[in-house]
């Protein structure tokens, strides 16, 4: 295949000036064959299998980065939800051993994070599910690279409100156990509705039960590239033209991810799973979803019209990206994590963006309320109620939604917290202080919605 000089120049510019990168290469590993009635044996099997399967993951990713000149920011692992293979773990201490085995394996192979300290409880808990969930605060506070996710709702099962109520308490406790780091443990914990089993992004990645023995899933990132493309349009460009340029740019971004993913799978002697089309921002200036929305004509992200602009962006990204790969999956849309997006941070600080507006935006974008810092004294029941609202959006709209929220110990509205790295920094946001205690304490399940009458 021959390339024109301007195509080569465009690619170089995308990487060097517009911050195009492969956000993650994530290896999904099946751990069901590690099951044992002895926790020590289980932990050892988990460590051995991960270190065997992923021993060359980082090397291959680094080689591809050098060959193609496209940064590969993260190398990660996702595993079978631990609750499915750990019924033999009878105490919090047993689960901590498993979490530390995951952490040790991640360190040994050199990956940034390992996801799958997870449970699927959308219809109810097994005894093992409950033990795992109750171990999460200590597991995340005593490890560096382990990430946890709990699926509490689906469109077909409804919402497990007992799980929602419990997760508010778990999030609070996780933040409190990591208060010396501004509650960062809660940044490694996400609550899902309709969680996908092939998501390459953290903290929600796990290797789903329908997946193969070992797969490579890839997530791309390119808000800066799309922002640069939109900045070339004048104010007279209509929404059709905006959509068209986003589609074309998204195709180019996704094509790079497809190439890297397939080569990585081939060199690791495993199968290629999916390409996740999600636009994932970073804290760097110009690499922001909020700035893209503002480039469409909003004075600030959060202004009236923000949800419509985000809907256009999300749809155009999917339409362009899906043409670049035969296997699209994961979350595939636009992320709106507050602490990881310089434009979102600016909008919150300006008073333009609230949790309620973010919730509205999650109706039309990729996931949900993400990396939001709230006052440390927010009641667990209020956190649970925020989760319930977000789960309802996912359940009714047949889409993945999630909550990753950090009640920062000792901080109040208007304070600032620094998480570091890709997790960025965030202003502590205001939370509605009216109580939902009685609502949350009712328990039970919110029934699955009727799907034939769509209004």
UniProtKB/Swiss-Prot annotation:
Subunit structure: Homodimer.
Coiled-coil spans in chain: none
Protein name: UPF0210 protein Teth514_2074
Domain of life: Bacteria
Database matches in Gene3D superfamilies: 3.20.70.20
Family, similarity comment: Belongs to the UPF0210 family.
InterPro entries: UPF0210
Entries under HAMAP family matching the protein: UPF0210
SUPFAM superfamilies xref list: PFL-like glycyl radical enzymes
């Amino acid at each position: 295949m021959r390339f024109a000089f301007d195509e080569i120049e465009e690619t170089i510019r995308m990487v060097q000036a517009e911050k195009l990168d492969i956000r993650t290469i994530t290896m999904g590993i099946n751990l069901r064959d590690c099951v044992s009635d002895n926790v020590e044996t289980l932990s050892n099997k988990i460590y051995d299998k991960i270190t065997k399967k992923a021993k060359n993951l980082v090397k291959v990713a680094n080689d591809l980065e050098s060959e193609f000149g496209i940064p590969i920011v993260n190398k990660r692992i996702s595993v079978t939800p631990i609750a499915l293979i750990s019924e033999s773990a009878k105490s919090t201490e047993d689960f901590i051993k498993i979490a530390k085995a995951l952490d040790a394996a991640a360190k040994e192979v050199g990956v940034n994070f390992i996801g799958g300290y997870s449970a699927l409880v959308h219809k109810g808990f097994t005894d093992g599910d409950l033990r795992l969930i109750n171990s999460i605060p200590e597991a995340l506070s005593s490890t560096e690279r382990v990430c946890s996710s709990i699926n509490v709702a689906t469109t077909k099962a409804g919402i497990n409100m007992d799980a929602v109520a419990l997760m508010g308490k778990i999030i609070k406790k996780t933040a409190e156990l990591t208060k010396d780091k501004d509650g960062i443990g809660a940044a490694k914990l996400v609550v899902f509705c309709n969680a996908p089993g092939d998501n390459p992004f953290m903290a929600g990645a796990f290797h789903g039960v329908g997946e193969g023995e070992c797969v490579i899933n890839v997530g791309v990132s390119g808000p800066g590239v799309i922002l640069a493309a939109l900045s070339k349009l004048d104010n007279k460009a209509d929404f059709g033209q905006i959509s068209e340029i986003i589609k074309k740019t998204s195709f180019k971004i996704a094509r790079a991810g497809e190439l890297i993913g397939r080569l990585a799978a081939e060199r690791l002697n495993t199968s290629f799973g999916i390409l996740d089309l999600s636009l994932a921002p970073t804290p760097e200036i110009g690499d922001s979803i909020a700035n893209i929305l503002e480039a469409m004509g909003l004075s600030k992200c959060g202004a009236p019209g923000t949800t419509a602009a985000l809907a256009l962006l999300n749809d155009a990204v999917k339409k362009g990206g899906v043409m670049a790969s035969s296997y699209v999956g994961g979350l595939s849309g636009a992320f709106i994590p507050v602490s990881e997006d310089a434009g979102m941070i600016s909008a919150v600080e300006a008073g333009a963006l609230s949790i309620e507006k973010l919730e509205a935006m999650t109706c039309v974008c990729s996931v949900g309320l993400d990396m939001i810092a709230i006052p440390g004294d927010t009641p667990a029941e209020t956190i649970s109620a925020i989760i319930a609202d977000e789960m309802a959006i996912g359940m009714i709209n047949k889409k993945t939604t999630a909550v990753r929220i950090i009640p920062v110990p000792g901080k109040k509205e208007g304070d600032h917290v620094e998480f570091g790295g890709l997790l960025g920094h965030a202003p502590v946001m205001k939370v509605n202080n009216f109580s939902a205690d009685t609502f949350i304490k009712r328990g039970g399940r919110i029934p699955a919605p009727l799907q034939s009458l769509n209004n």
